[in-house]
Amino acid sequence: MDSALSDPHNGSAEAGGPTNSTTRPPSTPEGIALAYGSLLLMALLPIFFGALRSVRCARGKNASDMPETITSRDAARFPIIASCTLLGLYLFFKIFSQEYINLLLSMYFFVLGILALSHTISPFMNKFFPASFPNRQYQLLFTQGSGENKEEIINYEFDTKDLVCLGLSSIVGVWYLLRKHWIANNLFGLAFSLNGVELLHLNNVSTGCILLGGLFIYDVFWVFGTNVMVTVAKSFEAPIKLVFPQDLLEKGLEANNFAMLGLGDVVIPGIFIALLLRFDISLKKNTHTYFYTSFAAYIFGLGLTIFIMHIFKHAQPALLYLVPACIGFPVLVALAKGEVTEMFSYEESNPKDPAAVTESKEGTEASASKGLEKKEK
């Protein structure tokens, strides 16, 4: 997981090619402000819209859009898995040719990026297609066995609009594969981030605290303790980071001196912020206090990261500042409102778990019957 915010004075990884060994001219204050302002905006968009879509996703009945629920056990293991993955990538780049590794990774993320971008733009297609558009339904079905022993391996339903989205996303994919252009990189990065915030759901606030706390330690260790994360971030030519050129004003779209923000700094706080939005809705008070508080906390934390980075002239682990802000601000609000118990007792069931679904239905029916009994009395 790439989670470091790069230091423009120490050089950034280039999304369009290998790192330039020659000394680059210093970026102008205007260029730096534009770059980091754009990174901040790009980070906020998938968090805001991903959180809104996560609410519809939790209520939806489409099996292909069911969220993946992260439990406390998953959260505790995640920093260990992320560390092993990061160290493995670092060793691969040290042992094998960087060119061949990035070629394989490019093909892998080419496919993933097309699917993620297609899923991202699909909801907007209804606004662009006329009502008379022939939207035909399709089904991709793979089964194993026959008769009573037949099992579904793949059962995917889609329509003509989904095929149009796939075609448009493929154009971006080919552009990225051939040019590694920073705009194509960002389109894929934004799609990955939005899909992550939308489809990855924490089951409760305690799990969110475990996940963010573990990755807080992970981020600090791998950025300050070693050069592993920064090395991987600069070597890894894949859309796992948002980038923006600091020399855009001088070189236009061919600019190549990039500031970057890892997708982990967007998705990890983003899924916690999305959880707080769903908690707000569960309170049924027609306010989104905790969502807006955590959203403002994210802006504060990322802004502080950028400020500290320029003071110390060193790449910063953004989660060092984002985690205390995104957890601390909402908890302080909950303390002030006397809703700490409600916040930490809020629980989301896994929609893919039949037992949880049954339990949820039984709970709903019980609540409804109690409500009827009260009305009769």
UniProtKB/Swiss-Prot annotation:
Gene Ontology terms: cellular component: cell surface; cytoplasmic side of endoplasmic reticulum membrane; Derlin-1 retrotranslocation complex; endoplasmic reticulum; endoplasmic reticulum membrane; lumenal side of endoplasmic reticulum membrane; membrane; plasma membrane
Membrane topology field: Multi-pass membrane protein
Broadest EC class assigned to this enzyme: hydrolase
Effect of D219A: Abolishes proteolysis of PSEN1
Result of altering G264A: No effect on proteolysis of PSEN1
GO molecular function, one term: ubiquitin protein ligase binding
UniProt modification remark: N-glycosylated.
Keywords for the protein's UniProt record, in alphabetical order: Cell membrane, Endoplasmic reticulum, Glycoprotein, Hydrolase, Membrane, Phosphoprotein, Protease, Transmembrane, Transmembrane helix
EC number: 3.4.23.-
Active site: D219, D265
Keyword Cytoplasm found: no
Tissue specificity annotation: Widely expressed with highest levels in kidney, liver, placenta, lung, leukocytes and small intestine and reduced expression in heart and skeletal muscle. Expressed abundantly in the CNS with highest levels in thalamus and medulla.
Consequence of substituting N20Q: Abolishes N-glycosylation
Ranges of the Cytoplasmic topological domain: 53-77, 122-157, 203-209, 278-290, 336-377
Keyword check for Ribosomal protein: no
Impact upon substituting D265A: No effect on inhibitor binding; abolishes signal peptide peptidase activity. Abolishes proteolysis of PSEN1. Abolishes proteolysis of XBP1 isoform 1 and increases interaction with XBP1 isoform 1
Positions annotated with a glycan in the UniProt record: N10, N20
A Pfam family the protein falls into: Peptidase_A22B
Domain notes: The first transmembrane domain may act as a type I signal anchor. The PAL motif is required for normal active site conformation.
Description of how the protein assembles with itself and partners: Monomer. Homodimer. Interacts with RNF139. Interacts with DERL1 and XBP1 isoform 1.
Family: Belongs to the peptidase A22B family.
This protein's name: Signal peptide peptidase
Organism, scientific name: Homo sapiens (Human)
Organism lineage string: Eukaryota, Metazoa, Chordata, Craniata, Vertebrata
Gene: HM13
